[in-house]
Structure formats: structure tokens, C-alpha cells
From Swiss-Prot:
Subcellular location: Cytoplasm
Gene: tdk
Protein source organism: Legionella pneumophila (strain Lens)
Active site as annotated: E89 (proton acceptor)
GO MF: ATP binding; thymidine kinase activity; zinc ion binding
GO biological process: DNA biosynthetic process; thymidine metabolic process
Catalytic function, reaction form: thymidine + ATP = dTMP + ADP + H(+)
Name of this chain's protein: Thymidine kinase
Family, as annotated: Belongs to the thymidine kinase family.
Main location: cytoplasm
Length: 209
């Protein structure tokens, strides 16, 4: 029986890397995969899933009004049967689109692997993540670390000076220049441990790199 999987994590946990590796594993065995990425993510070339380690793959860029169940049916008519559907940045899905993913698994018997953030910079659930947590068959946490070495579970938004931002719109597309993953303790303290050129972390206790 096909299942809906939600792989969630904080920023920079390698979600896109794991997605691309999973797709490669299917294709290496002669199976077809369908990749989706939200059009709202403008960090990279349109319709491309990119990882921080340099991997990339073409994907179907969807908007929040697209019906992913219908799209999958239509795209499958143009190709052989898909063995897996993979969604990048799944936190941007709408409630309706998460329901459509359940239809892909339940009606088409295709496993769906969704990868995304659990919470925003305010520590609140994204709509897509909320319903994936509620409806997915399997929940898998991908782990990354805070600058202190603890597991990072929070996403801190930072300004150009590396200071924590606590107000603003939920969605602000950005990478390492805008966000940093931290543990809950340093999230509450507003201490980002900002990475500077050369990948050296500034130690706020000793004022040294």
C-alpha cells in the first residue's frame, strides 16, 4: 500500500539533498519519479530543485492554486507510470494540496515523499506542515545542529547584521543570509551564532572566531 511520508527539519538539514538522492535511487532502477517544487521559491532557477552541496534536478513548479492530484494524472499520461512523487519545500503547500497528495497515494497507489520545514521563524507551523503532520502516514525528522552543537529545531530569521528578527510576514524567501537553524535555547535568546566568511562561527562568549 502506498503511503504519504513527511520528512521535516529545520533549515539546512539537507532536505533537498535527501529528496534528490531518493529520486536517484528510483531512477537508477529504471523507475520514473515526478518532482514538484513551489513556484514561490525563487532562490534558484525556475522549476529546479537545488541542494546546498551542488546537486540539482528539474521539477514541475506549482502554484498554490494547482491541483497536484490532477497534475499527476495528466503528467502520467505523457510518460510511463510514476513510481514515486516527491515534493520539495512542502511547507508551502495549501491544506487542499496536502489532501490532494493523500489522493495520489490512496487513489493512484503512488508513494509521496514530502520534504519541508515544520515551523516558521516565529516557531509556528506552516499550513502545509500542519496538515502533513496531521495526515501523513509516516513522519521522519531530518536532523541538523545549532552553532552550540545541540540539535537544531528552530528557524531564526536574521537581518543583515545577524540579529534575530521576531516580526514580519511568515514567508520571506531566503537562504543562509536570512535564516539560521538553532536549538530552542538559542532561539529564545535570539543568538544566531552567525556564520562569517570562511565558515568560522563567531563565539559570542569570548568575542572571537
Amino acid at each position: 500500500m502506498a503511503k504519504l511520508y513527511f520528512y521535516y527539519a529545520a533549515m539546512n538539514a539537507g532536505k533537498s539533498t535527501v529528496l534528490l538522492q531518493s529520486s536517484y535511487n528510483y531512477r537508477e532502477r529504471g523507475m520514473q519519479t515526478l518532482l514538484f517544487t513551489p513556484a514561490i521559491d525563487t532562490r534558484y532557477q525556475y522549476g529546479t530543485i537545488c541542494s546546498r552541496i551542488g546537486l540539482s534536478e528539474q521539477a514541475y513548479a506549482f502554484n498554490n492554486t494547482d491541483n497536484l492530484y490532477v497534475l499527476t494524472q495528466e503528467l502520467q499520461l505523457q510518460a510511463t507510470k510514476y513510481s514515486c512523487v516527491l515534493i520539495d519545500e512542502a511547507q508551502f503547500l495549501t491544506r487542499e494540496q496536502v489532501y490532494q497528495l493523500t489522493e495520489i497515494t490512496d487513489q493512484m497507489s503512488i508513494p509521496v515523499l514530502a520534504y519541508g520545514l515544520r515551523t516558521d521563524f516565529r516557531g509556528e507551523l506552516f499550513p502545509g506542515s500542519q496538515f502533513l503532520l496531521a495526515w501523513a502516514d509516516e513522519l521522519i525528522e531530518l536532523k541538523t545542529i545549532c552553532h552550540c552543537g545541540r540539535k537544531a529545531t528552530m528557524n531564526m530569521r536574521i537581518d543583515e547584521n545577524g540579529q534575530a528578527v521576531v516580526e514580519g510576514e511568515q514567508v520571506l524567501i531566503g537562504g543562509n543570509e536570512s535564516y539560521v537553524a538553532t536549538c530552542r535555547l538559542h532561539y529564545k535568546r535570539g543568538e544566531a551564532g552567525k556564520t562569517f566568511p570562511g565558515n568560522k562561527l563567531f563565539n559570542k562568549d569570548t568575542n572571537t572566531f
